[in-house]
């Protein structure tokens, strides 16, 4: 449930933005996440913590940052928002902020909490917040109003004439691209463009369809693009191959919302492509021990980490009071 949900007049306009924070245990200073677009405005999260502080006093500060595009000098964005730091051990372990009501301007582009929590709370081995060096922050955001922001979309013709400086060829078709944009988002493509083949502007891409390549480029350019049941798998594989988090995140957002992909498939995908937030949210939907038994019995190819997570979920369900019926109307207490 949204942390803004009590404000019923706002609930219809709330969007949830999920940010991945990588290599958190090495943080010394400030970390700024990838951008997320909402209402024609780009948002990111900034995390601050310094190693110079004594370990027992080291704290973590968290801020939401507003980055409007095509804005006038006197722009403003009035918002209500709050955030959660997601715990891999269950919803009850999440850390939840207070509700913020804030107007972002050119003079105040960020808002959050200084010294929100201690460093040890997030990094301790038994905390449940860090998963392979990464943790996730989920913002519930409502944009009440904005001024001085123009929503402009560059035409395909202008993009190809003034911005595109390279070509990707696949399936005999050509996609015109900005090589620097792709390289900034993918260390693999950076190495290909500027280390292995410097000066080259045309590259053949194998193993991926034209539609997948076009989807990747559209996501990176923040163009309108819909992930669907027909393309999410190709995009996940492409995002993993070229190490492009924004493509993987876009697919994860789709999988979190869709009902046309089964719980079992989502759990498998969450391990294959390291979609920890998807695994967390999908496990929340498993509320019956009988369902877990069926998953474990019918899907022998399920990954080790998912298997362990399901066993933990089963243990949690079995700790219910003796004699209590679970959601399938059965008494599983042994």
Swiss-Prot record:
BTB domain ranges (all copies): 164-229
SMART domains assigned to the protein according to its UniProt record, in alphabetical order: BTB (SM00225), MATH (SM00061)
The organism's place on the tree of life at top rank: Eukaryota
Pfam families: BTB, MATH_2
Coiled-coil annotated residue ranges, if any: none
Residue ranges of domain MATH in the record: 14-141
Record-given protein name: BTB and MATH domain-containing protein 39
Source organism (scientific name): Caenorhabditis elegans
